[in-house]
């Protein structure tokens, strides 16, 4: 039957990509339908019970800055929070949280059910309705036909998924859920370029059978307790739990090697390529044969369960090998496995077949997001989902696509990498992928993106007001640092050496003192207080606010979360100003031709002196801008120069020399 209501946007899949896509489209005013095979699994954490990490935490902050759900849901469900790389520079510091699976799923579902203009429907999707070269809806497994103006497909590992445990395998989307075989077959009929990838998960352990006295405890950060969302607070967190650390041994590795002859990975049963940076334990033992031990983290799955996730031993080995290997580790000698580990193979579609908006080049109105694009990880999926949901909504609203730049967001890096380079293995985000990472920090994601989110309708009034309070506070305190001067005579040498490293030779602005190595905001605030007190001796204080300027005073005025965020922003922006300025210059130089639009009808075979390889690649991929063309694998700077000359000379019909000038086109 044809459902009587037509929707603006249909989202297929209720995982991390699908939920963010549906919420984004609905926030932007589109009538949105989320189709899922099971409403009870909306927002389910199918693998590890954690959110964030290096590069990944940056994506979560960006999702949050755009009004997404992942960060707030993590704050409500997180049972341990840590800052990774805390001793390193601000660009690579990242938040990571262990999450209670039940609480996280409930937090996501609550947002879905209370989001205006968003409808849910429980049915697997078997087919897409396509007219000509455009999608106009979806068909469920019982034949209900839903019409829409755009469809966002976020099928995860369900497309022709197959689970492997040893040499046994069966069709599944994940453990306990059926695969989407009909939909996968339909997509292949549409001649979309596809391949196979694989990922895996470890066995789960009953915590009552773990000897914790033999393990190393790993607590979360306590002072201060991190939060993920710019709207979050540590008071939102439930009860906190520690993680625990054990190690594999040479005996463990012997057991694992003994199962290689029954491993689907080593016997050629699995054809899909797995994630390089999250290898299975059998892959680690094989590739790093010289290592006698690997660290394993035992992570609690939640407050209402005894289940533990042993991070570091993802495996598809036979169950008897899994059990023996686990029981060879310290503290796990009596371990009982609740769920076996497994690998899953699934279809993905080459992301080079997508436009910059994540709309497929072959089928108008059809957008892909998440693991279907060859990525791995909850955070990468959620970021793509939000991006695809935004652009599906903007297409419905007859607006240009939103395309964040590489220097603007990790989301921009993610999208650009996928559509220009494609994937040969599951793609995950790292800070090293971003050439402008000093600008793309966790602490300033809101300053980079919330304005754009508000303009697109993603950011509500409450978040917008909170953002403006922070932005105004940063501006005010930055000005105070620049305009407050300290005379050397007003700061005793002993205090100067204690606070800023050495006695002052002359008058300094506080901002210059803050730039010194080892000097933080608390130190310069105390400098200001001492100087103010000495200046005011014997007369009435000329500026009571200056006398009280301190972290404690700002916390009292704004609350701890905002005060600490503002201070962090001040310290980073001040100390790294020179580096940031240099990076801004690089951005400006790169932007000279980055956004130059390439004509859709450009024939690369007519560009003089291009190599056959470069012509083939550009003709096949058809990048949308010169910047994208420059990042295609095998395309050299010399090739880009030849292409630019071709465009400037107006050799492409309808593309005059004026069109190739810098700034003449915007992405």
Swiss-Prot record:
Q: Which organism is it from?
A: Methylibium petroleiphilum (strain ATCC BAA-1232 / LMG 22953 / PM1)
Per its UniProt record, what Pfam families does this chain match?
A: GIDA, GIDA_C_1st, SAM_GIDA_C
The record describes its quaternary structure and partners as: Homodimer. Heterotetramer of two MnmE and two MnmG subunits.
Q: Which domain of life is it from?
A: Bacteria
Describe the function of this protein. NAD-binding protein involved in the addition of a carboxymethylaminomethyl (cmnm) group at the wobble position (U34) of certain tRNAs, forming tRNA-cmnm(5)s(2)U34.
Give the HAMAP family listed for this entry: MnmG_GidA (MF_00129)
Q: Where in the cell is it found?
A: Cytoplasm
Q: Keywords assigned by UniProt? A: Cytoplasm, FAD, Flavoprotein, NAD, tRNA processing
Q: What is this protein called?
A: tRNA uridine 5-carboxymethylaminomethyl modification enzyme MnmG
> PANTHER family per the record?
GLUCOSE INHIBITED DIVISION PROTEIN A, PROTEIN MTO1 HOMOLOG, MITOCHONDRIAL
Name one molecular function that GO assigns to this entry: flavin adenine dinucleotide binding
Query: Which cofactors?
Result: FAD
Residues the entry annotates as binding FAD? 13-18
Does RNA-binding show up as a keyword for this record?
A: no
Q: Name one GO cellular component term.
A: cytosol
Q: Which family does it belong to?
A: Belongs to the MnmG family.
Residues that coordinate or bind NAD(+): 274-288
Q: Which GO terms describe its biological process?
A: tRNA methylation; tRNA wobble uridine modification
Recorded hits in InterPro entries, A to Z, give: FAD/NAD-bd_sf, GIDA_C_N, MnmG, MnmG-rel, MnmG-rel_CS, MnmG_C, MnmG_C_subdom, MnmG_C_subdom_sf
């Amino acid at each position: 039957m044809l459902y009587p209501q037509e929707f603006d946007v249909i989202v297929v899949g209720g995982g991390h990509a699908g939920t963010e896509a549906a919420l984004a489209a609905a926030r932007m005013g589109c009538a949105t339908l989320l189709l899922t095979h099971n409403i009870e699994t909306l927002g389910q954490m199918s693998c590890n019970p954690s959110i964030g990490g290096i590069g990944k935490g940056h994506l979560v902050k960006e999702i949050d800055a755009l009004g997404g759900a992942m960060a707030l849901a993590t704050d409500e469900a997180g049972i341990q929070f840590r800052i990774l790389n805390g001793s390193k520079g601000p660009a690579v510091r990242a938040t990571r949280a262990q999450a209670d699976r039940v609480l996280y799923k409930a937090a996501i579902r609550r947002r879905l059910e209370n989001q205006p203009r968003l409808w849910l429907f429980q049915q697997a999707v078997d087919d897409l309705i396509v007219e000509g070269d455009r999608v106009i809806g979806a068909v469920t497994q019982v034949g209900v036909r839903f019409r829409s103006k755009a469809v966002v497909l976020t099928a995860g590992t369900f497309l022709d998924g197959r689970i492997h445990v040893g040499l046994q395998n069966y069709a599944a989307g994940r453990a306990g859920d059926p695969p989407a075989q009909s939909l996968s077959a339909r997509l292949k009929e549409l001649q979309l370029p596809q391949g196979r990838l694989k990922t895996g998960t470890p066995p789960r352990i009953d915590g009552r059978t773990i000897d914790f006295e033999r393990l190393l405890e790993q607590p979360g950060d306590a002072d201060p307790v991190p939060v993920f969302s710019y709207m979050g607070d540590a008071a939102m967190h439930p009860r906190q739990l520690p993680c625990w650390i054990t190690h594999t041994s040479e005996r463990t590795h012997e057991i694992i090697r003994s199962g290689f002859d029954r491993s689907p990975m080593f016997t050629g049963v699995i054809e899909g390529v797995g994630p390089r940076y999250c290898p299975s334990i059998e892959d680690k033992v094989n590739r790093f044969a010289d290592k006698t031990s690997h660290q394993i983290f035992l992570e609690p799955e939640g407050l209402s369960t005894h289940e533990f996730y042993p991070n570091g031993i993802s495996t598809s080995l036979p169950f008897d090998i899994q059990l023996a290997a686990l029981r060879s580790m310290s503290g796990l000698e009596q371990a009982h496995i609740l769920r076996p580990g497994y690998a899953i193979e699934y279809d993905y579609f080459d992301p080079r077949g997508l436009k910059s908006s994540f709309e497929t080049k072959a089928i108008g109105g059809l957008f892909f997001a998440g693991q279907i694009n060859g990525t791995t990880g909850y955070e990468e999926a959620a970021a793509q989902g939000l991006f695809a949901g935004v652009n599906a909504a903007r297409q419905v609203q007859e607006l240009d696509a939103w395309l964040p730049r590489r220097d603007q967001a990790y989301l921009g890096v993610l999208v650009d990498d996928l559509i220009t380079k494609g994937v040969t293995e599951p793609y995950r985000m790292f800070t090293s992928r971003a050439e402008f990472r000093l600008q793309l920090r966790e602490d300033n994601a809101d300053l980079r993106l919330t304005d754009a989110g508000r303009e697109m309708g993603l950011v509500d009034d409450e978040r917008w007001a909170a953002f403006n309070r922070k932005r105004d506070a940063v501006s005010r305190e930055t000005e105070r640092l620049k305009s407050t001067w300290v005379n050397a005579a007003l700061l005793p040498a002993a205090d100067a050496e204690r606070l800023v490293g050495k006695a002052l030779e002359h008058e300094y602005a506080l901002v210059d003192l803050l730039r010194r190595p080892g000097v933080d905001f608390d130190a310069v605030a105390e400098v200001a207080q001492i100087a103010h007190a000495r200046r005011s001796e014997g007369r009435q204080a000329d500026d009571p606010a200056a006398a009280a300027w301190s972290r404690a005073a700002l916390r009292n005025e704004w609350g701890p979360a905002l005060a600490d965020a503002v201070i962090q922003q001040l310290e980073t922006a001040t100390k790294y100003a020179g580096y940031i300025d240099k990076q801004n210059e690089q951005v400006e130089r790169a932007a000279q031709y980055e956004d130059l639009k390439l004509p859709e009808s450009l024939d690369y075979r007519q560009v003089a002196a291009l190599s056959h390889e470069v012509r083939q690649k550009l003709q096949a991929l058809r990048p949308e801008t010169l910047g994208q063309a420059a990042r295609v694998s095998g395309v050299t700077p010399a090739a880009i120069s030849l292409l630019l000359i071709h465009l400037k000379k107006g050799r492409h019909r309808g593309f005059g020399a004026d069109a190739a000038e810098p700034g003449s086109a915007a992405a």
